[in-house]
Amino acid sequence: MTNTSLQIGDVYALQEKEIGKWFAFQIVQIGEENAVYIDLDYWSEMIPEENDLNKMSYLRLNHHLWNNETNQCWAPIKFFPSHAKKVGNMSIRPFEECKSFGNWPNGSQQKWTEKWKKLPKDQVLAFKEARTKWNETIIVAGKEVKKNIYGLFDDTLSAVKDFSEFDKLPGLGRITTTKDNPQLIPFLERRCLIRELVWDNCQRRELDLSRTHLEEVEISGEDIEVIILPSSISNLTLRGKLSPNLRIHSPNDGYFMVLRVELHDDFLPDVGLSRLTNLRLTSIQDFNLKDIPARYPGLTWLGLAGKPGYIREVSKISNLRELETLTMDDLFGFSADDFPHPGNLPELRHLWIESVPAEAGKIIKKLYKGKIQDFQVLKLRSVEWLHENLNNPLRNWDGSEFVPKSKYYKSVALWKETRRRMMEEASHAELDFSAVKRIAIDYAEGFNKLDRRSSFIETEEREDIFNAFEQILNETGLSEFKEEIIQLIDEKRSW
């Protein structure tokens, strides 16, 4: 139902949670279920008053890849923030047609605008210019690369003796590596617009990133015992086996930071970060939540995803009194009696549950219906379904609105037959690699046929198909051929 209190031209203010400053936005278009807002250039420690309206304009964004553009977005009227303060109403200015759909603003655009104003202007201008050089190339490390290249990988990183060679590439924003180079961290420290680092198999005991400008870091390596993060960090992802001694140091002790952990054998070390606000655990097989509230009492977001798997002591979530968002996917082993009641989570606004026990899901649905702002319970599973699909990498397609039921069953049958053939081939004393390639081609062509008449394979399904074959390679001990086989499937596919 439309919230009739919203009017075109209305200006509202909210307080950004990390820094605490106030920002403003204007309603410029209203539809049946959604409204368009535009961010304004107000950013202050003071709550705006009506006499501040004549000083406000549309916020022009120039951070990251923005180029003097306004940020307008369709957002659901039913989720309009109830704590927003109405400042007043002013005439709207001309704006471009809005094609973006998302959530109501949280002050991130104003915050990033202020941060980028403090960066070295020469690096920002060079970065912006480089990102426009779509067709120009340059020789770096003896290789021809595009001037607007955003990411570097091991092949290029290993080809230079001096990282100053990469000063020819001011548009860089991401480094992906599996090797340790003593020049890497100093390079990241002086390049303030390289915001992402992916480091697999890091073998350092201590990783000091405190003087870098990184926003997103993804790390794997069981030798790491200390990670020191910069003040710019927003997302840290840990993958693979972790040291029980691992400690993570952050200037804000994890406040307003996302910590993602892809669990290995369900082990989550106590890494510190006592003020962490956003925790997301994936690849859960059998995990107990008993320690989570004591370690991270200030969580506002908790995301839990199984492999699928079992989750224990779900009732402990009731101790997270500041929790605003809870997501659970592919998790079993709990009942409705274990699940927190609405009154136990006073700040909860968003509850997204998918692929959970059918009996528990039905009761949770009744408990929360009409009690919170944003709520969905999907793909309720029986015990029989879990037993049949525990190792099925395409199980998420079952019940998907984008994958027809018949296509799902045929896809699973194709995957199972591919797995059977690969297991048989891998059991031979001598591997016939030509036979392995034939199986991979049949796999790709099988999905070509399934997708031919009713195209259902999009980006997410495509990734699932590749991941499903990678699972077969891992199971059969043929993961060393992954790159070549995946490339072959990529060449033969039409989806």
What are these regions (language model features)?
Residues K379, S455-W495:
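Amphipathic alpha-helical binding modules
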Residues G9-D10, Y42-E45, E49, K128-E136, ...:
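Mature N-terminal, pre-catalytic/accessory segment of carbohydrate-active enzymes
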